[in-house]
Regions:
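Short beta-strand/loop motif that positions the catalytic acidic residue
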Residues: 171-172, 178-180
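Acidic catalytic loop of the alpha/beta-hydrolase fold
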Residues: 183-187
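Conserved alpha/beta-hydrolase
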Residues: 35-57
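The serine-hydrolase catalytic nucleophile loop
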Residues: 20-34
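Short alpha-helix in the alpha/beta-hydrolase fold that links the catalytic acid
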Residues: 30, 188-198
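Hydrolase active-site cap/lid region
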Residues: 101-160, 169
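C-terminal catalytic histidine-bearing segment of alpha/beta-hydrolase fold enzymes
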Residues: 197, 201-287
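Alpha/beta-hydrolase active-site loop
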Residues: 61-81
Length: 287
């Protein structure tokens, strides 16, 4: 299920993928970015209901792995039915991780169909699924010996690919803009920077960090709307998102260490109204 906003003159299609616990309506507001920057003429847009949301079947999302399968199948469907073969993936939270998974893990299937992922934008994404599973277990005070079993079961359910489900592996080849707020309690800035540090020298990957704003709600912050819009537009127009990218990288890497310490101290604080909607640590229930 999803909405296709077709632009006959555009040769690229943007897939805007929501996070867990919401549906395609949550992604609709981001169309305004493209109207405000006159980029709406450059793309067709497809906004899907990924599994476990909206009109799609109820099922497990496995921290975004299953969203990756959905986004991959969405590209195949748009290729088969509408002849679309050039995509930009724009995803939030698990939809961000799913976008990265679709482009990298399922790349061979895309190539066979002549499908190309041109660029990606990921906002408030999970950055390392193994660490996220362990973090969620810690928040729920699951005993350590059970956590190791849970991780093994989870790895089995994602086709023994758990060690690949991290941004430092998934993001290298495709030009990508990572958007993150330092105050995100669901997908923490500290965890993201651990991944980003490994790929910070890769010119294909750009990072835009905001001081405030909650999980997947940076654009909704009135003070940031213009800056967020400009970052997305500049990235899509092949301009530098941060004028002093290297300086920003150094500053962010240093600050991430501080944030990580604070995050560890508050490991049992769910703190965000979106936490329960976001957390996917229920994958082993009722199956």
């Amino acid at each position: 299920h999803g909405w296709l906003l077709e632009n006959k003159d555009a040769d690229k299609t943007m897939i805007i993928s929501h996070g867990r616990g919401v549906n395609r309506l949550a992604a609709m507001q981001y169309l305004q970015i493209f109207k405000d920057t006159s980029l709406d003429k450059e793309y067709s847009f497809f906004i899907p209901d990924l599994r476990n949301s909206g009109k799609s079947d109820i099922s497990r999302t496995k921290m975004g792995y299953c969203f990756g399968q959905d986004i991959y199948n969405t590209m195949l469907m748009l290729n088969e039915k509408f002849g679309k073969n050039n995509f930009v993936l724009y995803g939030f939270s698990q939809g961000g991780m799913g976008s990265a998974i679709a482009a990298k893990i399922f790349n061979n299937g895309l190539r066979k169909k002549g499908i190309k992922v041109d660029k990606m934008i990921i906002d408030s994404s999970i950055s390392n699924i193994r660490k996220k599973v362990k973090e969620d277990a810690k928040k729920r005070r699951v005993p350590k010996f059970i956590v190791s079993v849970v991780v093994r079961v989870f790895n089995f359910r994602v086709g023994n690919k758990l060690d690949k489900l991290r941004l430092s592996y998934l993001l290298r080849r495709i030009p990508t803009l990572i958007i993150q707020t330092k105050s995100d309690k669901a997908t923490t800035y500290g965890m993201l920077m651990e991944e980003y540090n490994e790929i910070a020298q890769n010119k294909n990957v750009q990072l835009k960090v905001f001081e405030r704003g909650s999980h997947t709600r940076i654009y909704a912050e009135q003070d940031y709307k213009e800056e967020y819009t400009e970052a997305v537009a500049n990235f899509l127009k092949d301009k530098e998102v941060n004028s002093a990218q290297e300086e920003t990288n150094e500053k962010n890497i240093q600050e991430a260490e501080t944030v990580k310490v604070e995050a560890d101290e508050n490991a049992n604080d769910k703190g965000s109204e979106y936490y329960e909607k976001f957390s996917d640590f229920d994958f082993d229930d009722n199956e």
